[in-house]
């Protein structure tokens, strides 16, 4: 979506405009980092469709899909963004699929660009038809001229076409259709006599039809995007895009509220706040209390009501402006090399002491490493280094320790400690953890109820129990010699798991504990049957789990990525495999996970983190799986939401005899749900002695 924020007065934030093309003031100048990122992504999509349409037999029609990403670029961005994407996609397609792939990209860029520009200018189908006919005539005339000049090439092409037609005629003759065979050869011979006119007609009609298909697809896509609330958009106000004074702090929020489009209630209730230069402010509150919404307002989004005063513009992502580090670093790390990512997006001519920044975040030894090989904690510290390279006056850290293990959390906190003194920046730290909030100069709580203000605490590592004695009950899952290697047989091969052996009994609760990069998620996907192990086997009732996908349900670490529908009832019905019209079954599924059935009519993007996890569980449990695997189920949840989710899972395990496997780097409060604990380190299950020694180190 493209949501522009308009505000004519420096230091004030204006109104949010509806979805549409990007503002006209961005038409000049070189490509900005956001435009370059969009061009890269869309170029990759266009190149993939063009390559598949050439190298896969009978897949030529897939080339039409390439008009959608190029059309979206033409609709939302400058023409030079589309040109950059076309050049990149064309080079990739040519290197892999030859001239056919290159021409597929060119056709997609032309047709997608045509439909996108027409859409952006508010014109309709007649304009598309006229424009495509003109374009078809130009393309056809160019092709006729080329073939007229290149006589030998023309004769070669016609010979190939004649051979194909003769083959078709011979096939028809064998089917006792001699008349049809003769007609095919006669009509083709007549067409060759008037080949310039046939070619012109072919290009005119063909491009018009493909343009109409692209127009329809782009219109459907934009219509669908309009129905998705713009929940976490970080577009800066237009004042930030000109040479205006950058001054994000001190900032004062006076009686600020925020409500997302089409929402029934405020996401952020009335709040007044001052953020002073050089201070460390912690923001705490329950899931759904508005912490992330407040972060968006501090980063430049306009409130629904109230005023936001600051001495200059927000300067989001600019030198001396505002920098934001989010809880999912994968979305912020764009460089392929660690050192490159630190300076990615900085203005030309800007110098940054990359070595000092990497040393500050503890990554000085990894400067030449591929960012794809970093652990979650290392990625988060890299994102922090890239933010600090902009020398921000205000740094916003939104739940940056949520997705990392205790070791990574300690490393991040060590970096954040004293950050305001080392860099003379204001630090706004949104967190659930008690020790993180305690280190702040001030703490702001967005929760009214005392029950929602308690913080997440850390706990001692539980004693490991990894014995594999004969089970008292029938085994639900059995892993025998499981090992897995990514990119096996290539120079980039990486071993994730080695010789994993254990049994999970029916109705058992097992915690698989390990740090970032230990192989926990790989093991979870193997147990769910979504990944086939390189060696060994994961068995359910004696059969490999990958042959019975769905019998073992998997809840992803990021619940939002598992929710594919727009509304709760549609999501639950789709995941469970029944019709959304069966509202009684939807209501029953929601009730099982402790949600009000009335929630079924709510949009997914209006849910809190805890509600999203429960909606995922509702859909999975409605399929009556033999076992349930949860990958980092407590990540991103406040203390109350964690307790509620754990109680729900404990009740389900006792009442249904449900087999539960939790994969997590957190273990606080897991004792009742998971009496048995396995420790995973570097892809290997550890013995009790080794695990205890590792925990003390």
UniProtKB/Swiss-Prot annotation:
It is a multi-pass membrane protein. Disulfide bonds: none annotated. InterPro entries: AAA+_ATPase (IPR003593), ABC_transporter-like_ATP-bd (IPR003439), ABC_transporter-like_CS (IPR017871), ABC_transpr_CbiO/EcfA_su (IPR015856), ECF_ABC_transporter_ATP-bd (IPR050095), P-loop_NTPase (IPR027417). It comes from the Bacteria. The keyword Metal-binding does not apply. One of its GO terms (cellular component) is ATP-binding cassette (ABC) transporter complex. This is Uncharacterized ABC transporter ATP-binding protein Rv2326c. It comes from Mycobacterium tuberculosis (strain ATCC 25618 / H37Rv).
């Amino acid at each position: 979506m493209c949501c522009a924020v308009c505000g004519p007065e420096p230091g004030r934030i204006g109104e949010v405009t509806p979805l549409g093309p990007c503002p006209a003031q961005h038409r000049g100048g070189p490509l900005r980092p956001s435009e370059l990122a969009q061009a890269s992504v869309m170029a990759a999509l266009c190149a993939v469709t063009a390559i598949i349409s050439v190298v896969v037999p009978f897949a030529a029609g897939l080339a039409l899909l390439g008009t959608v990403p190029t059309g979206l670029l033409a609709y939302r961005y400058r023409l030079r963004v589309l040109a950059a994407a076309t050049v990149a996609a064309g080079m990739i397609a040519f290197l892999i699929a030859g001239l056919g792939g290159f021409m597929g990209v060119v056709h997609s860029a032309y047709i997608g660009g045509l439909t996108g520009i027409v859409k952006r200018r508010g014109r309709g189908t007649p304009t598309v038809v006229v424009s495509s006919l003109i374009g078809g005539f130009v393309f056809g005339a160019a092709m006729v001229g080329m073939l007229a000049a290149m006589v030998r090439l023309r004769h070669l092409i016609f010979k190939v076409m004649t051979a194909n037609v003769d083959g078709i005629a011979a096939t028809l003759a064998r089917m006792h259709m001699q008349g049809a065979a003769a007609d095919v050869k006669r009509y083709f011979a007549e067409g060759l006599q008037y080949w310039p006119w046939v070619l012109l007609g072919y290009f005119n009609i063909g491009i018009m039809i493909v343009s109409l298909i692209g127009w329809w697809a782009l219109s459907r896509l934009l219509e669908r995007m309009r129905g998705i609330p713009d929940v976490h958009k970080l577009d800066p106000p237009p004042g930030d895009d000109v040479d205006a004074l950058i001054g994000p702090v001190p900032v004062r929020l006076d009686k600020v509220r925020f409500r997302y489009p089409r929402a029934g209630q405020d996401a952020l209730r009335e709040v007044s706040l001052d953020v002073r230069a050089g201070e460390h402010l912690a923001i705490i509150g329950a899931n759904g209390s508005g912490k992330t919404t407040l972060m968006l307002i501090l980063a430049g989004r306009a409130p629904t009501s109230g005023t936001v005063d600051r001495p200059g513009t927000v300067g989001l992502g600019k030198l001396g402006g505002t920098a934001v580090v989010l809880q999912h670093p994968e979305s912020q790390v764009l460089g392929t090399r660690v050192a490159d990512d630190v300076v990615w997006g900085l203005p030309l001519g800007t110098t940054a002491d990359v070595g000092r920044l990497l040393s500050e975040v503890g990554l000085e030894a990894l400067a030449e490493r591929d960012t794809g090989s970093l652990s979650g904690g290392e990625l988060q510290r890299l994102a922090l280094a890239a933010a600090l390279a902009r020398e921000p006056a205000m740094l916003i850290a939104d739940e940056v320790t949520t997705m990392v293990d205790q070791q990574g959390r300690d490393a991040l906190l060590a970096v954040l400690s004293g950050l305001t003194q080392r860099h003379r920046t204001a630090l706004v730290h949104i967190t659930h953890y008690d020790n993180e909030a305690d280190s702040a100069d001030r703490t702001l709580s967005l929760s009214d109820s005392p029950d929602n203000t308690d913080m997440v605490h850390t706990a001692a590592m539980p004693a490991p129990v990894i014995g594999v004695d004969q089970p008292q009950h029938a085994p639900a899952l059995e892993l025998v010699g499981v090992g897995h290697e990514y990119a096996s047989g290539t120079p980039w091969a990486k071993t994730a798991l080695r010789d994993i052996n254990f049994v999970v009994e029916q109705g058992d609760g097992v915690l698989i504990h390990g740090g970032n990069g230990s192989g926990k998620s790989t093991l979870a996907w193997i147990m769910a049957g979504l990944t086939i192990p390189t060696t060994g086997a994961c068995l359910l009732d004696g059969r490999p789990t990958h042959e019975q996908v769905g019998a073992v349900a998997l809840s992803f670490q990021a619940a939002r990525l598992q929710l594919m529908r727009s509304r709760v009832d549609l999501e639950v019905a789709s995941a469970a495999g029944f019709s959304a019209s069966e509202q009684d079954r939807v209501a029953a599924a929601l009730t099982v996970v402790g949600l009000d059935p009335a929630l079924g009519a709510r949009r997914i993007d209006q849910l809190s983190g805890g509600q999203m996890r429960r909606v995922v569980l509702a859909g999975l449990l409605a399929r009556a799986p033999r076992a349930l695997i949860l990958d980092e189920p407590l990540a991103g949840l406040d203390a109350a939401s964690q307790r509620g989710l754990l109680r729900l899972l404990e009740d389900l395990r006792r009442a249904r005899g449900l087999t539960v496997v939790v994969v997590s780097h957190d273990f606080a409060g897991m004792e009742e749900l998971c009496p048995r604990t396995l420790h995973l380190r570097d892809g290997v299950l550890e013995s009790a002695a080794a695990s205890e020694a590792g925990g003390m180190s």
